[in-house]
């Protein structure tokens, strides 16, 4: 047995009709874990409904429908393998909460695959002022997705078909846009593909023999292996807390940074409750330690279920333990807010697993989105497309960290009017020590503070 392949997370972005589902579906279909029987069932249904155009998008539509109905589909369906990596598509867009998911997302994407519709009219719609191509690329960059692959899709439908001139024109325009966002286009492969016909997806296409670069599969293999933050102090935001008969209180969540293991003394922020971890489990198996990316349940001693809540963060009490934030300063980009945002604005922040109202107590500066340079001091308000530094005050105890130290706890979505109106990353946090924090007997025995 060789060394197990490295896991990477991919987010697929682009305008509504760019062919994201078809392209993603095609990869999963050809390289993935979808059972042949399931595919045959989908194909039969598609044929019955005369969806000739089915093929790959249909696969994804079925998966999405099942996912939205709350049927948890076998996550293997969203995975595929390249020569070097196991790839997971972390959120197929088109999903209502795509932006929110991308931010509070179950995981950080290692690479964004931007799908461009190369057809006449299609490309222009995607890149226009209202097109999602721009918004998604900006979002990916702001949230620290540093690597990107760009697919010029629907090359089978350009005029003339498989047109090099059209491809060149698109590259020029998209490069200049991605540069404005902050990416370096020289480092981005632009792969001409047809997600439907399969050109340059997995095998080289003879229709595109003027193109000498990598296929999509080869481009995925060329992604730089990301570093996982296991050497940082522990941060584990709680998703749920269960009471399990005969075992006791079991908080559940995903290790974002660091590691957790039995015998460790953990502190839960913001309350400061400190106790010992008795055991750590993943998929009903005991672990000696859990690392970043692992979704685990862990048993804690002498703690009532009511003392822990979703959004609390577990950390190692002896290694930079987490604390609640009195206030914090963030770099915010306003994305789709119809009016003006001034001091006193109080939306809801979605950050890791917490969902808490915060007040924009002070808009400090307006800045250039790309360079981060200050344009204006203490502006009266921010509006759509603006970026600024804002001091925020949570209305309830909340745990956040700076994006530079603990990325998953330092990026957030601002929600208002049932949509994401802004995104941001946290630059500094003013932390406060908890008062009257409970330390359990088990923790004292272990020599906690």
Swiss-Prot record:
Positions contributing to GTP binding:
14-21, 91-95, 153-156
Q: What does its PTM field state?
A: Trimethylated on Lys-396 by ATX1 isoform 3.
Q: Which GO terms describe its cellular component?
A: cytoplasm; mitochondrion; nucleus; perinuclear region of cytoplasm; plant-type vacuole; plasma membrane; plasmodesma
Q: Which domain of life is it from?
A: Eukaryota
Segments carrying the region annotation (G3) are 91-94
Q: Give the region (G5) as residue ranges.
A: 194-196
Q: Which InterPro entries does the record cross-reference, listed alphabetically?
A: EFTu-like_2, G_TR_CS, GTP-eEF1A_C, P-loop_NTPase, T_Tr_GTP-bd_dom, TRAFAC_GTPase_members, Transl_B-barrel_sf, Transl_elong_EF1A/Init_IF2_C
* Keyword Nucleotide-binding on entry: yes
Stretches for region G1: 14-21
The places in or outside the cell where this protein is found are:
Cytoplasm; Cytoplasm, Perinuclear region
Q: Where is the tr-type G domain?
A: 5-230
List residues modified as N6-methyllysine.
261
Modification N6,N6-dimethyllysine, positions = 55
Question: Keyword annotations for this protein?
Answer: Cytoplasm, Elongation factor, GTP-binding, Isopeptide bond, Methylation, Nucleotide-binding, Protein biosynthesis, Ubl conjugation
Q: G4: where is this region? A: 153-156
Per the record's keyword annotation, is Transferase included, yes or no?
no
HAMAP family per the UniProt record, alphabetical: EF_Tu_A
Q: Which family does it belong to?
A: Belongs to the TRAFAC class translation factor GTPase superfamily. Classic translation factor GTPase family. EF-Tu/EF-1A subfamily.
| NCBIfam families given in the database record | EF-1_alpha, PRK12317.1
Q: What is this protein called?
A: Elongation factor 1-alpha 4
Species whose genome carries this gene: Arabidopsis thaliana (Mouse-ear cress)
């Amino acid at each position: 047995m060789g060394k197990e392949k490295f896991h990477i997370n991919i987010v697929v972005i682009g305008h509504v009709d760019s062919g994201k589902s078809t392209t993603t579906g095609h990869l999963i279909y050809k390289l993935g874990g979808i059972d042949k029987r399931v595919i045959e069932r989908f194909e039969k249904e598609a044929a019955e409904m005369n969806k000739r155009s089915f093929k790959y998008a249909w696969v994804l539509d079925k998966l999405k429908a099942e996912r939205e109905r709350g049927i948890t589909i076998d996550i293997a369906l969203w995975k595929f393998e390249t020569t070097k990596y196991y790839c997971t598509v972390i959120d197929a867009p088109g999903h209502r909460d795509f932006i929110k998911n991308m931010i509070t997302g179950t995981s950080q994407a290692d690479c964004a695959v931007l799908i461009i519709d190369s057809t006449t009219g299609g490309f222009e719609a995607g890149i226009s002022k209202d097109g999602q191509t721009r918004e998604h690329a900006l979002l990916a960059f702001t949230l620290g997705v540093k690597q990107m692959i760009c697919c010029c899709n629907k090359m089978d439908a350009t005029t003339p078909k498989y047109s090099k001139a059209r491809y060149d024109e698109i590259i020029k325009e998209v490069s200049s846009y991605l540069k404005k966002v902050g990416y370096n286009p020289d480092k981005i492969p632009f792969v001409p593909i047809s997600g439907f016909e399969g050109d340059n997806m997995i095998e080289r296409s003879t229709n595109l023999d003027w193109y000498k670069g990598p296929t999509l599969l080869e481009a995925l293999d060329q992604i730089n292996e990301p570093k996982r933050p296991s050497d940082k102090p522990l941060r584990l935001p709680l998703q749920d807390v269960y009471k399990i008969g005969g075992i006791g209180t079991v908080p559940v969540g995903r290790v974002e940074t660091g590691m957790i293991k039995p015998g460790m003394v953990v502190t839960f922020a913001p309350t400061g409750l400190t106790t010992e971890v008795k055991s750590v489990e993943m998929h009903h198996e005991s672990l000696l330690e859990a690392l970043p990316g692992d979704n685990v349940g862990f048993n804690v001693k002498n703690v009532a279920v009511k003392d822990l809540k979703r959004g609390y963060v577990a950390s190692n009490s002896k290694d930079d333990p987490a604390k609640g934030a009195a206030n914090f300063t963030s770099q915010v980009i306003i994305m789709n807010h119809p009016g003006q945002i001034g001091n006193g604005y109080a939306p809801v922040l979605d950050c890791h697993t917490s969902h808490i109202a915060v007040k924009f107590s002070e808009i400090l500066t307006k800045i250039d989105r790309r360079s981060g340079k200050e344009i204006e001091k203490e502006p009266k308000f921010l509006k759509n497309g603006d970026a600024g530094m804002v001091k925020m005050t949570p209305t309830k105890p909340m745990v956040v960290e700076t994006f530079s130290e603990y990325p998953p706890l330092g990026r957030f979505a601002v929600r208002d009017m049932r949509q994401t109106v802004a995104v941001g990353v946290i630059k500094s946090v003013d932390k406060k020590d908890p008062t009257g924090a409970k330390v359990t007997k088990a923790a004292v025995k272990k020599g906690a503070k």
